[in-house]
Amino acid sequence: DILNNYRRKTYDIKKRETIFPELPLPSKKEQIVSFPQDLRKIFSLVSVGSKSFLTQKVDRTVGGLVVQQQCLGPLDLPLSNYSVVKHSFFSELATISGIGEQPIKGIIDPVAMVGLSIGEMLTNMIWGVIDDIDYIKCSGNWMWPNVDSYEHYLLYDSVKEVSKILIELGIAIDS
């Protein structure tokens, strides 16, 4: 049996206290000098910059079933809260997709970040017609550095929180 010959991977998970250093405010002169750099940093944030890596994963037009895309307008910007794709030309059923992401909050509190991300996803989808929360399914994407025992702990704690919230809501992760 091929699978029995592989060693099981084990993780050393350790919790530690996170200490944030005091953040000094820059002087007026420093603010003016750093403005272009700061602006570039702001536009590189997922919450502000392009979400094309999230919204352009599939061919959205060939089948003719796309009712609304998350990217809108002549510049194809991801401005819509949700997208809608019909199941067929002969049915009223459709799939609504919404995205929730809160990366900056994850720096301070990863567990709070996952709850806020789920809340954002549901709030974005509320504008589509959903008959019952039982019809909502999630797709989880764990993009985590996972390089040391503390990162393992944060990932484990965050996944536990996702599980707790989705079980309370009756929502499954199916991919």
Which residue ranges define each predicted feature?
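Glycine/proline-enriched, intrinsically flexible loops and inter-domain linkers
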Residues: 1-175
